[in-house]
Swiss-Prot record:
GO molecular function terms noted in the UniProt entry: asparaginyl-tRNA synthase (glutamine-hydrolyzing) activity; ATP binding; glutaminyl-tRNA synthase (glutamine-hydrolyzing) activity
PANTHER family per the UniProt record, alphabetical: GLUTAMYL-TRNA GLN AMIDOTRANSFERASE SUBUNIT B MITOCHONDRIAL AND PROKARYOTIC PET112-RELATED (PTHR11659), GLUTAMYL-TRNA(GLN) AMIDOTRANSFERASE SUBUNIT B, MITOCHONDRIAL (PTHR11659:SF0)
Gene source species: Tropheryma whipplei (strain TW08/27)
Record-given protein name: Aspartyl/glutamyl-tRNA(Asn/Gln) amidotransferase subunit B
Swiss-Prot/TrEMBL GO biological process terms: glutaminyl-tRNAGln biosynthesis via transamidation; translation
Alphabetical list of PROSITE patterns matching this protein: GATB (PS01234)
EC number: 6.3.5.-
EC top class named in words: ligase
Function: Allows the formation of correctly charged Asn-tRNA(Asn) or Gln-tRNA(Gln) through the transamidation of misacylated Asp-tRNA(Asn) or Glu-tRNA(Gln) in organisms which lack either or both of asparaginyl-tRNA or glutaminyl-tRNA synthetases. The reaction takes place in the presence of glutamine and ATP through an activated phospho-Asp-tRNA(Asn) or phospho-Glu-tRNA(Gln).
Protein family membership: Belongs to the GatB/GatE family. GatB subfamily.
Record field: catalytic activity: L-glutamyl-tRNA(Gln) + L-glutamine + ATP + H2O = L-glutaminyl-tRNA(Gln) + L-glutamate + ADP + phosphate + H(+); L-aspartyl-tRNA(Asn) + L-glutamine + ATP + H2O = L-asparaginyl-tRNA(Asn) + L-glutamate + ADP + phosphate + 2 H(+)
InterPro entries: Asn/Gln-tRNA_amidoTrfase_suB/E, Asn/Gln-tRNA_Trfase_suB/E_cat, Asn/Gln_amidotransferase, Asn/Gln_tRNA_amidoTrase-B-like, GatB, GatB_Yqey_C_2, Gln-tRNA_amidoTrfase_suB_CS, Gln_synth/guanido_kin_cat_dom
Length: 504
């Protein structure tokens, strides 16, 4: 392939069309069709369980084993469907999706085909730049996950592997697959995809139906991309590629952007775009060819003979609807109005993915501005360095306590950052951190003594301030703060010096 065209050049002649398939692992205690502990649920964790220890005959596809449906997983699926604005089916009907792959022990996957659990939904998404798009949702259906392959090669991929290992702990984990209709967002397509998945993550977290950790595979996104020459009929959808298992918001955006550029380069040079699956290489910033993309008829779907259709009563759906928390979109609108934030301020909170944390910090007693300052600033910075979620570092109550101590004059921003670090690094309470490291502000009498000493020792600077060069007061403030070890309120100290040297 010739040198890849720029993103701007790709958009001159082609209109990108994307479609998204988002797989959400449900955090039920047991798997979808067996009593085995769910590796994505509260009874087990990916880090602590050995391979092939969370399995039953059903997970392994052993002859004679029969599936039974996990009712909690169905309830979670209904709640998620409602939150996506979908209609809910009258019956739960499973189907067999037939294909061969080593991580699929039965040689078929129990999924849904022409009768999904939820259908015809719509989500309003807002990109980081503030553009609003509506993404239509074709369906959301229940299915079981496959096992996990570990290829023993230098790249971790099957190419060049001497052998592969299979872990069936993930086999049978309940999934909801959310499938969008084609999205026409032009140049904003990568950002819309990112915002869509981010909103789904907010929704499943608010519902409590998934751990929603992309880096752990609790949410995985497959991105379909095709390019249509501008001016071509609206009903024409060219060959598409499907980039599989994108597991970070950044990867979703970058992979779609790259695929648009790659396809534009191919078409511009007279080559055809193969309808295939592709894999994203984060380290190289490119997609690599996988296998030819199968159409639905090649999976030979047919009704699951071991599971009869299960009625879904309307009163059950309504009961689930009434038990659901406030929708994240409604929450956003309400909090923005209550906090009196500008569009820019509120988008800063959304882009840092800390809306819930800021809300809980405000409810714990902090001001909206104070809560935002900590969660979008220092805490997000530390979380980014450690590659974890900000919510894993510190509780909203602790942040509110720190902010309250600042307002009372017991801490300043510098000392508060040290308290924050101690709380995060050593799992101390706020008071324990203050006492252990003696981090409260110095009493006013001590500050006054230091101030008198600094003024007497810096008469030249004092005269500059008196003569009107007020910027020189920073030297005096700095000397005081150095002597006090930073344990003073610099802004109050500055005002005190100005009041003393420039009396009205």
């Amino acid at each position: 392939m010739s040198e890849i065209v720029t993103y701007e050049d790709a958009l001159k002649d082609f209109e990108p069309i994307i479609g998204l398939e988002v797989h959400v692992e449900l955090s039920t205690q047991t798997k979808l069709f067996s009593s085995a502990p769910n590796i994505a649920g509260p009874l087990a964790s990916c880090a602590s369980q050995g391979p092939n220890t969370l399995v039953t005959p059903v997970c392994l596809g052993l002859p004679g084993s029969l599936p039974t449906v996990n009712e909690r997983a169905v309830d979670y699926g209904i709640a998620l469907g409602l939150a996506l604005g979908c209609s809910i089916a009258d019956e739960l009907i499973f189907a067999r999706k037939n294909y061969f792959y080593p991580d699929l022990p039965k040689n078929y996957q129990i999924s849904q085909f022409d009768s999904p659990l939820a259908y015809d939904g719509k989500l309003e998404v807002e990109t980081e730049s503030g553009d609003v798009f509506f993404v239509e949702i074709e369906r959301a259906h229940l299915e079981e996950d496959a096992g996990k392959l570990a290829h023993k090669s230098s790249t971790g991929r099957i190419q060049g592997a001497q052998y592969s290992l299979i872990d069936y702990n993930r086999s049978g984990v309940p999934l909801v697959e959310i499938v969008s209709r084609p999205v026409f967002a032009d140049r904003c397509a990568p950002q819309v995809a990112r915002a869509f998945v981010e909103l789904i993550r907010e929704i499943v977290l608010s519902l409590g139906v998934s751990n929603a950790r992309l880096e752990r595979g609790n949410i995985r996104c497959d991105a379909n991309v095709s390019l249509r020459p501008r001016g071509l009929g609206a009903g024409i959808l060219p060959n598409r590629t499907e980039t599989k298992n994108l597991n970070s918001l950044r990867s979703i955006e970058r992979a779609i952007r790259y695929e648009i550029q790659r396809q534009a380069t191919l078409i511009s040079s007279g080559e055809l775009v193969r309808q295939e699956t592709r894999h994203w290489r984060e380290d190289r910033g490119i997609t690599l060819s996988g296998r030819v993309k199968a159409d639905s008829h090649e999976y030979r779907y047919f009704p699951e003979p071991d599971l009869l259709p299960i009625p879904i009563p309307s009163d059950k759906v309504e009961a689930i609807r009434l038990s659901m928390p406030e929708h994240p979109l409604a929450l956003r609108r309400r909090l923005k109005a209550e906090w009196k934030f500008s569009d820019l301020q509120f988008r800063d909170v959304l882009n840092s993915s800390v809306l819930k944390q800021v809300d809980e910090t405000v409810r714990a007693g902090a001001t909206p501005d104070g809560a935002k300052k900590w969660w979008t600033g220092e805490i997000t910075r530390i979380a980014s360095q450690r590659r974890c979620n900000a919510s894993d570092l510190i509780s909203p109550e602790a942040v509110a306590e720190i902010e309250l101590l600042i307002s009372k004059g017991i801490l300043n921003d510098s000392l508060a950052r040290k308290v924050l670090a101690a709380v995060i690094d050593e799992s101390l309470s706020v008071q324990q951190a203050i006492e252990k490291y003696d981090l409260s502000l110095t009493e006013s009498a001590s500050v006054e003594r230091v101030l008198e000493k600094v003024l007497s020792e810096n008469q030249e600077v004092v005269q500059k301030v008196i003569s009107g060069k007020t910027q020189a007061v920073g030297v005096l403030v700095g000397s005081c703060m150095k002597t006090l070890g930073g344990k003073a309120d610099a802004s109050k100290l500055r005002q005190t010096i100005l009041n003393r040297l420039l009396p009205r």
